[in-house]
Amino acid sequence: MATKIGIISDPHATPGPVEEALSIFRQEGVERILCAGDIAGYGDSLDETVALLAAHGCQSVIGNHEAWYLDRTIGRGESLTYRYLSGLPLSLKMEVEGKVLYMVHASPPDSLMDGIRLLDEQGELVDRQLIYWTDRLQGLTYDLLVVGHTHQVFAESMAATLVINPGSTLCNHSCAVVNFPALQVHWYSLSSQPLLKSWNWGMNRL
């Protein structure tokens, strides 16, 4: 029987799109929810976003914005936000329906900044980038690699691994559901906005 996993990334302290993604996941009957990091940054509702993710049992990895937040808030360990973010791992590995899934914010094994960027400004695949990252990811033993960070939406096979970036719930207006063991990816748009495949050129694009 198929298992569904809901995947989000880069909510950037903005709970509205996250809440919408969680509603989609409930409707789709997902069994697990993953977030590829950058819960913090840009937005002004970090506490609400963290509370929402925690209440729904979302498993997340740390992103660069969480690392920066924790550096600025040393000693504030009593808040739910601090406890949640400080407990996030650099990476997450699990087996689902016989498939090995690995999640990291930017790129494996544990980078927070070296993001997998495959698309141009129009959201078109850049062949040289695909070749570059396919070469870099040779030797991975994962069936599915989940990343975030670059605010790009893609699912591309590289070497023996399917690499998925669900995009930012805030910037790309996107989330994904993956069916296991077939590794079929279904995309969903958020905030009554079209899904924006590539967003890297300024907050005025929101």
Please identify what each model-predicted range represents:
Residues M1-G6, K93-Y102, M158-V163, L183-Q184:
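Beta-strand-turn-beta hairpins that frame and shape the catalytic cleft
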Residues H12-P17, G41-D44, E66-D71, P109-S111, ...:
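Active-site environment of divalent metal-dependent phosphoester hydrolases
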Residues L144, F154-L206:
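Acidic, His/Gly-rich catalytic cores of divalent-metal-dependent hydrolytic chemistry
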Residues A2-E95:
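Core catalytic region of metal-dependent phosphoesterases/phosphodiesterases
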